[in-house]
């Protein structure tokens, strides 16, 4: 049986912490920022944990 390939899109979008949690970037911070408030863009800066419902699928794509 051949090895599973890592999903290229997933490896660019998600990172695994030392404790095994999966982090992701927040959406809506790429362009059209002039009409978004500073408060909103500041809040979107940080990474966030992946929701519990998506963890199993993302781990499979990353080959974890």
UniProtKB/Swiss-Prot annotation:
InterPro entries: Ribosomal_bL35 (IPR001706), Ribosomal_bL35-like (IPR021137), Ribosomal_bL35_CS (IPR018265), Ribosomal_bL35_sf (IPR037229). Keywords: Ribonucleoprotein, Ribosomal protein. One of its GO terms (cellular component) is cytosolic large ribosomal subunit. GO terms for molecular function: structural constituent of ribosome. The keyword Metal-binding does not apply. GO terms for biological process: translation. The keyword Transmembrane does not apply. It comes from the Bacteria. Belongs to the bacterial ribosomal protein bL35 family. NCBIfam families: rpmI_bact (TIGR00001). This is Large ribosomal subunit protein bL35. The lineage of its organism: Bacteria, Bacillati, Actinomycetota, Actinomycetes, Micrococcales. The gene is rpmI.
């Amino acid at each position: 049986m051949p090895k599973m390939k890592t999903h290229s899109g997933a490896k660019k979008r998600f990172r695994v912490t030392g404790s095994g949690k999966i982090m992701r970037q927040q959406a809506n911070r790429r362009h059209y920022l002039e009409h978004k408030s500073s408060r909103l863009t500041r809040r979107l800066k940080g990474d966030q944990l992946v929701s519990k419902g998506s963890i199993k699928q993302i781990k499979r794509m990353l080959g974890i």
